[in-house]
Amino acid sequence: KAPADLKEAMDLAYYIGQRPADVLSLSIVKVSDGILEYRQGKTHTPQRIAITGPLEELLKRIEVRKATFKVASINLLVDERGQRMTKAKLRSRFEKARSDAGIAGKDFQFRDLRSKSGSDLKDQHGLESARALLGHTSVTMTEHYTNRRRGAIITKIPVRK
């Protein structure tokens, strides 16, 4: 039920595992030769993500929707009028969709998509893949970041003697 621009923003945040501000800052000039290239705002870590699979499908979906507007925006994410998606627009759309879904604000925030992305990637491809996607310099930080979402997996339990 969420509007297309919000779905695109949420999908992009999940697929690339980045902070909301970094997702909003992306532009089409950051896409070249099958690579999405950018620098994280908080840590200034350079990131290069291969555009394949669901990310490729998402970028095509965004491109198709953007082609319907008279004025072309270099911003990757645009609103329903083709204008740059701002932090305020994203927040209001997200809060409305969350409310419509009956989810409390404290239970789910847009930024939680980053942790979800890292946790899912860790489960699917290992800790190092999650570390690279999230741009962490240490696996310790990635472990903390991904474990806080669901808790660490306990592999040892006591045995009766």
Regions found by a protein language model. Name each.
Residues 40-44, 127, 134-159:
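Catalytic-site neighborhood detector that most strongly recognizes the C-terminal catalytic loop/helix
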Residues 41-61, 72-96:
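C-terminal catalytic core of Y-nucleophile DNA break-rejoin enzymes
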Residues 108:
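Glycine-rich phosphate-binding loop
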Residues 16-64:
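Conserved tyrosine-mediated DNA breakage-rejoining catalytic core shared by Y-recombinases
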Residues 64-69, 79-82, 158-161:
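C-terminal secondary-structure termini that scaffold catalytic or DNA-interacting sites
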Residues 8-11, 15, 21-22, 96, ...:
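C-terminal catalytic core of tyrosine-transesterase DNA break-rejoin enzymes
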Residues 6-7, 87, 91, 114-115:
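Short, leucine-enriched amphipathic alpha-helices that occur as contiguous helical runs
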